[in-house]
A protein has these predicted regions:
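Alpha-helical residues within the helix-turn-helix
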Residues: 34, 51-52
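C-terminal regulatory/oligomerization modules of transcriptional regulators
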Residues: 96-148
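A short alpha-helical element within helix-turn-helix/winged-helix DNA-binding domains
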Residues: 30-37
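Short, hydrophobic-biased segments on the C-terminal half of alpha helices
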Residues: 47-48
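Conserved segment of winged-helix/HTH DNA-binding domains
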Residues: 73-97, 117
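Key DNA-contact positions within bacterial/archaeal DNA-binding proteins
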Residues: 41
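Short acidic, hydrophobic short linear motifs in intrinsically disordered regions
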Residues: 23-30
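Beta-hairpin "wing" of winged helix-turn-helix
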Residues: 55-63, 67-68
Length: 148
């Protein structure tokens, strides 16, 4: 599976915002851009899609920015990727439908539909909160000193 940069950057930006979800702080596109090293113009496109999907709330003005529309535990990776990667969840094209419809039928029922369902289930089970927890855990582990 190949996730576009829009999906990868959007997921990274949402994790970054979720890490500040306990505060009422608004996060600007500039802040995300600087912290993650992503183009501001590209992030504006990503946030536009996230806002349209009602995953973030935007506040305009000098003190404006973005914050999550829901708690991180109520938002899944599926929600985010579905907003940013609509082609990821499209039906697979037929490959041999005209000459071998029985093969195509088996492929669709046993492989493509099953694979889609497994991926969607895993993405729905993976919450933004669980990703933030993993980032926090990773930070703790990287700060440990090991002596021999």
């Amino acid at each position: 599976m190949r996730i576009s940069s829009k999906g990868r950057y959007g997921l990274s930006a949402m994790i970054f915002i979720a890490m500040t979800a306990n505060t009422d702080e608004l996060i600007t596109v500039n802040c995300v851009s600087e912290k993650l090293g992503i183009s501001k113009i590209y992030l504006e496109q990503v946030f536009s899609l996230l806002k349209r999907a009602k995953l973030v709330i935007s506040i305009k003005g000098a003190q404006g920015g973005y914050q999550l529309a829901r708690k991180p535990e109520d938002m899944s990776c599926y929600d985010i990727l579905h907003a940013l990667e609509q082609s990821l969840f499209e039906q697979t094209d037929s490959s041999v439908d005209e000459r071998a419809p029985e093969i195509e039928k088996v492929l669709k029922a046993s492989v493509w539909t099953h694979l889609d369902n497994v991926i969607i289930k895993e993405l729905k089970d993976l919450t933004l909160k669980s990703l933030v927890d993993k980032v926090d855990s990773s930070k703790l582990n990287s700060n440990l000193m090991y002596y021999i």
